[in-house]
Amino acid sequence: MHPEASEPPVDSAAEPSLEESAGDHGDAGPGVRKEEINETKETCVGPCTTSCQSQQQPSGDNGSDGLFTHSRDDRDDRGPRMTKQFLQKLCKQHKLYVTPALNDTLYLHFKGFDRIENLEEYTGLRCLWLECNGIQRIENLQAQSELRCLFLQVNLLHKIENLEPLQKLDALNLSNNYIKTIENLSCLPVLNTLQMAHNRLETVADIEHLRECLQLCVLDLSHNSLSDPEILSVLETMPCLRVLNLMGNPVTKHIPNYRRTVTVRLKHLTYLDDRPVFPKDRACAEAWARGGYAAEKEERHQWESREHKKITDSLEALAMIKRRAEERKKARDRGETPLPESEKSIPTSPEAQEKPPKGETQQKMESFVKESFEAKDELFPEKPGEGEELSVVVGNRAVEDADLSGNLAHTQTPVVVTPEEVTSPVEATDGARTEDTEAIALETKEKLFIDDLPDLEDVDGTDVSVEDQTKDTGIRKIQAISSLSDDSDLELEELPLSVFEGTPISPTGALSHIFAVSKDPSEAARVPFADICMPTATTDLETQSQDPSTASSHPLIQELGEDELTEGESNQPLPPQSCASDPTLAQSSEGGDSQLPAATPLGDGAENEAQSSLYPEEPSTRIGLEDIEFGLD
């Protein structure tokens, strides 16, 4: 009915669309938005005005309350905080101590903190990393009195302040901040390194405070806005300045001959910008300051000539050392004793002999060479009798041991073994025994040392010590076996030492005859006891015909059981026995069997004669004894 009354709802319904359209267009400013809102307010007429105002008032109050609470939440939760729980969790993550005071390093970089707080319990910190955060102020570091390094680069700092508690601070990094003036650093008595790169420093007044930093050695002012060349007047008053970086500042272009000028004015500078200041560079810069480019060129030439001479002298000294070493080697080869270095004249090349020595340089070279040889002699002393070593002759070889042979010369006789004894291996009729003999002969060609000789318990039949050769006092046991009887047993016969008095003792020991080999390849060597029994048989026949009553009742070979043998050896030794004729052997010998002679008792003369005829044929018995011994094993 009334169109005016119907229009406000339409306009009010269209109001959000207007606001949305204004919000969608980013170019539309707040003035446009306010005009649209005012237009919509003007459209509210009649009875709807009060209703609209009543609706807008509570909505405005709610909006202000919501904005206040939202700003308060932003202030409280706008980023991570350095809470105690967070710090403990961080220490656990980095495998640090859970007890705060025990930690000396704390890594708080790249965490997004906007302020420094809750570090009161971390009193033992020596290094604190706070780089790459949003910190706007240096504060709350009163408990860190032991701090040495503080890293605050890449933050939002505008001022240097609150560093008085850090009396032991050595390195401070404030790069990539918004600091315009260097200040409040004189309270740090041991500050050694200050990094102020990428800040807002511009004038000499901004760095004037550096005059009070007496212990500062490393200063980085790169990539600032310093343009006044008078900054050098401030820098040259710093007594300990060694490293300076001014790269990225306009002042490097405003100072003529920048590097030479800075090097000359800063007397103790050792590193400028991106490279060191060498002594040669400083000397050339000072020469340039005195006489320009010509003086600099002359000074550079002198330095180059000195460096070249130094290299040449070192090469000559090395050549002299090599030459003297060759002379000493030749003198040793000729058998001459080389003179000590102090008595020697300086052997040089013909060119050096023609030229006189060059004073101090030559003396330095000589002293260097002498010191080199003295050091070599101390490390590797030469023995005067290095090539003269006493040796113990074994066949055609020598057992070389200088130290032992000198001590053994007074206590024992030298071990001398004839080549026949060394090369007399065990031989046999079969081919396998010959191969073993050749192998043994090859093994004996190796050098033998006294330390390699076995102990007395390890002596074989072929390896006998000196005591076995010189001392042979025990009662020998002779094992006699008939080689023609298949069922012959081991016989043990003990003879006194007086029986063997006339027999020469083999130098290889009492048991060496067991392993000795006969050199006669005839058939007689294959029957061990045939040659022994032949002379004894003839002597038996003669003695029987002369004195038949002297025949002994004891057999030639006495058979002993194992029990009797052990009892006899344990209780008392068997008495000496004389040979008697065996009936079986006698009958076989009378029947014309020359291989089985009979034995008869021998008198003193017959005994000596039999013994003298017995031992020349020992090699034939040794084979049989060896075979029986191996057979018993």
Curated annotation (Swiss-Prot):
| Cellular compartment(s) | Cell projection, Cilium
Where is the major localization of this protein? Answer: other
Q: At what positions is Phosphoserine found?
A: 349, 465, 488
Q: What is the superkingdom listed in this entry's lineage?
A: Eukaryota
Q: Species name for this entry? A: Rattus norvegicus (Rat)
Residue numbers spanned by region Disordered: 1-80, 326-364, 404-436, 538-633
GO process annotations (BP): axonemal dynein complex assembly; axoneme assembly; cilium assembly; cilium movement; determination of digestive tract left/right asymmetry; determination of liver left/right asymmetry; determination of pancreatic left/right asymmetry; heart looping
Q: Where is the composition biased (Basic and acidic residues)?
A: 22-42, 70-80, 326-344, 352-364
Output the Gene Ontology terms for molecular function: dynein complex binding
User: In this chain, where does the modification Phosphothreonine occur?
Assistant: 462
Q: What is this protein called?
A: Dynein axonemal assembly factor 1
Q: Give the record's keywords alphabetically.
A: Cell projection, Cilium, Leucine-rich repeat, Phosphoprotein, Repeat
Entries under Pfam families matching the protein: LRR_9
Composition bias type Polar residues, residue spans? 538-555, 568-592
Q: Write out the biased-composition intervals (Low complexity).
A: 46-60, 413-427
Q: Write down the PANTHER family for this protein, in alphabetical order.
A: DYNEIN AXONEMAL ASSEMBLY FACTOR 1, PROTEIN PHOSPHATASE 1 REGULATORY SUBUNIT SDS22-RELATED
Where does each LRR repeat begin and end? 101-123, 124-145, 146-167, 168-189, 190-211, 215-236
Gene name, per UniProt, is Dnaaf1
- Any Gene Ontology CC annotation: axoneme
Q: Which PROSITE patterns match?
A: LRR
- Disulphide bonds in the chain: none
Residue ranges annotated for the LRRCT domain, each copy included: 249-288
Instruction: State the protein's purpose.
Output: Cilium-specific protein required for the stability of the ciliary architecture. Plays a role in cytoplasmic preassembly of dynein arms. Involved in regulation of microtubule-based cilia and actin-based brush border microvilli.
In the record, the note on similarity to other proteins reads: Belongs to the DNAAF1 family.
